[in-house]
Amino acid sequence: FPGADTFAGEQLHAHSYVDNSIFDGRRSVILGMGNSAMDIAVESSYVAQRTYLAGRSGVWILPKYVFGKPVDQMRNDPRVPFAVRQRFIQAMIRSYVGPPERYGLPKPRHRFGQAHPTISGRILDRIQHGTITPKPNIESLDATSVRFVDGSSVEADIVVYCTGYQISFPFFDEDFLSAPDNHIELFRRVFHPQIPNVFFIGLLQPLGAIMPIAEAQGAWVGDYLIGDYRLPSEAELVADIAADQAAMRRRYVSSKRHTIQVDFDDYLHALSKERAAGAQRARENGFKPPVECLPSAATAAS
């Protein structure tokens, strides 16, 4: 932002955030509307002199619990058309917490499910109690203050940018593998069609926990390595990835954040079907592992 280099206070990205002691007695501005931004704003609000949450665009906010259960454990049957599920969940959110703009937050410019929602059980409560003040996007900074696009400004001591992440693979040469604009084409978010036997576990963003999906991916790769699963042909992989990318572009708001987005239940359902299809291909191939197992060169000690 213009003037950021003149700001006398502290600036950091959410990646560097550890705990809320950095906000103690200070005036903080948190930029972002994702999970990190709202979690950090809530933590700031308990110790900071003032906390401002600046939003670049609106998001749908989900409570952490609905009907006594974690929100990501709500049944989301992939056999039901997405449009039907979308309307039901959006109506439920509106009846449960109301529209975000009621709290002074920006209005989402998309329907529920077209962008990654934010899950927070405390943000709306802290806003209603006046310990967090919503603001629009930042326009500029000067030595002691932050100016917003609506013309208002506040004195600030620290600014935290919760503005997303860049996918990179520093352990690979860029000409071997990279993710420009966070875009990397993988079959079911795990297998690269042109780079055999390199696997990506957990490189996705679900609505829900990553760990159960990563565990399912790991089991899938395990089946592949011992020969119990066989991939489709490279041409089929490329075609499937292209279809998946096209569906993603139709479904989600264009954003670097959504290049690895998946629906938790839909993904696991599709993965289960693919593992079954791959098991049949492996059976027809004689359950041959993809990597030849060679005898060890070691000899027994005398």
Where are these regions (language model features)?
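PP2C/PPM-type serine/threonine phosphatase catalytic domain
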Residues: 73-76
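Flavin (primarily FAD) cofactor-binding/catalytic cores of flavoenzymes
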Residues: 1-65, 78-234, 249-302
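Short low-complexity, flexible loop/linker segments enriched in glycine and/or proline
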Residues: 67-70
